[in-house]
Amino acid sequence: MEIGSSSTVAGGGQLSVPPGFRFHPTEEELLYYYLKKKVSYEPIDLDVIREVDLNKLEPWELKEKCRIGSGPQNEWYFFSHKDKKYPTGTRTNRATAAGFWKATGRDKSIHLNSSKKIGLRKTLVFYTGRAPHGQKTEWIMHEYRLDDSENEIQEDGWVVCRVFKKKNHFRGFHQEQEQDHHHHHQYISTNNDHDHHHHIDSNSNNHSPLILHPLDHHHHHHHIGRQIHMPLHEFANTLSHGSMHLPQLFSPDSAAAAAAAAASAQPFVSPINTTDIECSQNLLRLTSNNNYGGDWSFLDKLLTTGNMNQQQQQQVQNHQAKCFGDLSNNDNNDQADHLGNNNGGSSSSPVNQRFPFHYLGNDANLLKFPK
């Protein structure tokens, strides 16, 4: 047994004890020492348990009425004399002004030294309101009564009680479980959404599936929508990507790189004529800075000379048609039809029309095969 530093005895006097001592008796001590002496009217050496009329006090009022010492206290002890609920009955009246105490469970036997039975413990819960309806509270009371074969204990005799407020561990654990369940359900929903979006993106792009991570869920959710529509304009983006890095027009070396880039894009575009690429390279070499100093007027003169040559050839053909008669005219018409079918209806020579470089003293093969 421990006693507080400054305790009030039943007679009203003050008891001086060393600081740090608390009143915390065991169940055996409550029954075999305190209650037995109380019933037998024997003096108690340290009488710190007060007598309380349980029907006139509420459980929250016992905190001040039954305080022992000045230190913190979470259990309150008192003696109570049980009253009959009915004059001719045996039931105990445990009602107060605000509620009532209701017994719960079965009585527990208390043994001395694990052998001799010395008493019983009844557990009661306080309800606010009136029986049988009431609101359950967290106030608990353990009521101890003697059960000795030598003494006949009446139902309306003395009892010693311990009142405390139940620590709501179960409610805190239940709330924690609800929070854990909520977080677990949210995590499952996130994973389900993650799997759903990953499945959509895998179907839209089988060659490069998108892998989602929980932290990047919002970013990839926006990226998935773009990936779904990617096949619709992938062809156009491929062509525009290649055109964004075209070399300069007047660089022969860059023209070769452009030809290689165009050749790599053949699965997406129509086939490119190799002869046209080679002729373009030769044209760039002729018009480069090394040969003509970057003067593009040369190309204008070249095209003008080609047009004049075509007009002269047309005049010669007309003169020959008049001289040689209908036979020559028919032959020229057949030749013109043949040239028109090959060149989209044009009657002029493709070599002279496209590349009239023979006036410069260059061979036509120069335009077909790169140096």
From Swiss-Prot:
Disruption phenotype: Additional root cap layers; increased number of columella (COL) and lateral root cap (LRC) cell layers in the mature embryo and in the postembryonic state. Lateral cap cells continue to divide and fail to detach from the root.
InterPro entries xref list: NAC-dom, NAC_dom_sf
Protein's GO biological process: plant-type secondary cell wall biogenesis; positive regulation of cell fate commitment; regionalization; regulation of DNA-templated transcription; root cap development
Keyword Nucleus attributed: yes
Entry keyword Isomerase: no
Annotated tissue distribution: Accumulates in maturing root cap cells, in both COL and LRC cells.
Record-annotated DNA-binding residue ranges: 118-172
Signal peptide: none
Consequence the record notes for mutating R22W: Additional root cap layers
Region (Disordered): 176-213, 316-355
Induction: By FEZ in oriented-divised root cap stem cells.
Gene Ontology cellular component annotations, sorted alphabetically: nucleus
Alphabetized UniProt keyword annotations: Developmental protein, DNA-binding, Nucleus, Transcription, Transcription regulation
A GO term for molecular function: DNA binding
Low complexity bias (residue ranges): 202-213, 340-349
Location in or out of the cell: Nucleus
Free-text domain note: The NAC domain includes a DNA-binding domain and a dimerization domain.
Main function: Transcription regulator. Together with BRN1 and BRN2, regulates cellular maturation of root cap. Represses stem cell-like divisions in the root cap daughter cells, and thus promotes daughter cell fate. Inhibits expression of its positive regulator FEZ in a feedback loop for controlled switches in cell division plane. Promotes the expression of genes involved in secondary cell walls (SCW) biosynthesis.
Name the record gives this protein: Protein SOMBRERO
UniProt lineage: Eukaryota, Viridiplantae, Streptophyta, Embryophyta, Tracheophyta
